[in-house]
Amino acid sequence: MEAMWLLCVALAVLAWGFLWVWDSSERMKSREQGGRLGAESRTLLVIAHPDDEAMFFAPTVLGLARLRHWVYLLCFSAGNYYNQGETRKKELLQSCDVLGIPLSSVMIIDNRDFPDDPGMQWDTEHVARVLLQHIEVNGINLVVTFDAGGVSGHSNHIALYAAVRALHSEGKLPKGCSVLTLQSVNVLRKYISLLDLPLSLLHTQDVLFVLNSKEVAQAKKAMSCHRSQLLWFRRLYIIFSRYMRINSLSFL
């Protein structure tokens, strides 16, 4: 028991040490800067519901801003599972404004083809057609979305991955268009916040974004825009989830 306690303390000290290094510079020098992720790209963030952009992808959005990416956002539903669609669309726009995504670059799909419902399977080909249209119209050269695990396992998240995976494997994406997927982690790693940083550094192969303290506050402010969703367990999520601080992503 004592050994476990000492291990937790050591991990905490190590993690906060890493954070100090990131906070000490004006701009974090992340792995993506020396890898395959260039500057000034036109990036499309593809999400399933309003609040995905803040709950899961805030480190990516803010990290891309450091690299001067022009970020577009495509949300495949209005989040109307509890008949709150109109409210949630407004909350999404407020959150995007906090994260620095131009409102003119935000597209929300609100139709019966893509219901906010974990029990409904979205048609992969239909999702892929809509996605490809937005990629081509906006001249996108980087697509960011969920991986096969969908982070939370939500079927709508996984449907987005299936669609972009199909476009990629079938060679339908425009030349020079890459795909990044957000790594799903186990429940323990998901809820240890910054303590996951050493593991993220060890296991991330392609792109790693880690927020400094100022950026974490910005991410939390974006999440707080989704007032209709701030139930007690989501407030705990904001405090403990690694996804409010850390995003590790892989190229297809």
Swiss-Prot record:
Membrane protein topology class: Single-pass type I membrane protein
Gene (UniProt): PIGL
EC numbers for this chain: 3.5.1.89
UniProt record similarity statement: Belongs to the PIGL family.
Purpose: Catalyzes the second step of glycosylphosphatidylinositol (GPI) biosynthesis, which is the de-N-acetylation of N-acetylglucosaminyl-phosphatidylinositol.
Coiled coil feature spans: none
A GO molecular function held by the record: N-acetylglucosaminylphosphatidylinositol deacetylase activity
Domain of life: Eukaryota
Organism, as annotated: Homo sapiens
Protein's recorded name: N-acetylglucosaminyl-phosphatidylinositol de-N-acetylase
Biochemical pathway: Glycolipid biosynthesis; glycosylphosphatidylinositol-anchor biosynthesis
Residue intervals passing through the bilayer: 2-22
Topology feature Cytoplasmic, residues: 23-252
Domain comment, as recorded: Retained in the ER by two retention signals, one located in cytoplasmic domain, and a second signal in transmembrane domain that is functional in the presence of membrane proximal residues of the cytoplasmic tail.
Disease linked to the protein: Coloboma, congenital heart disease, ichthyosiform dermatosis, impaired intellectual development, and ear anomalies syndrome: An extremely rare autosomal recessive multisystem disorder clinically characterized by colobomas, congenital heart defects, migratory ichthyosiform dermatosis, intellectual disability, and ear anomalies including conductive hearing loss. Other clinical features include distinctive facial features, abnormal growth, genitourinary abnormalities, seizures, and feeding difficulties.
A GO BP annotation: GPI anchor biosynthetic process
Entry keywords, A to Z: Deafness, Disease variant, Endoplasmic reticulum, GPI-anchor biosynthesis, Hydrolase, Ichthyosis, Intellectual disability, Lipid metabolism, Membrane, Transmembrane, Transmembrane helix
Database matches in SUPFAM superfamilies: LmbE-like (SSF102588)
Any one of the GO CC terms: endoplasmic reticulum
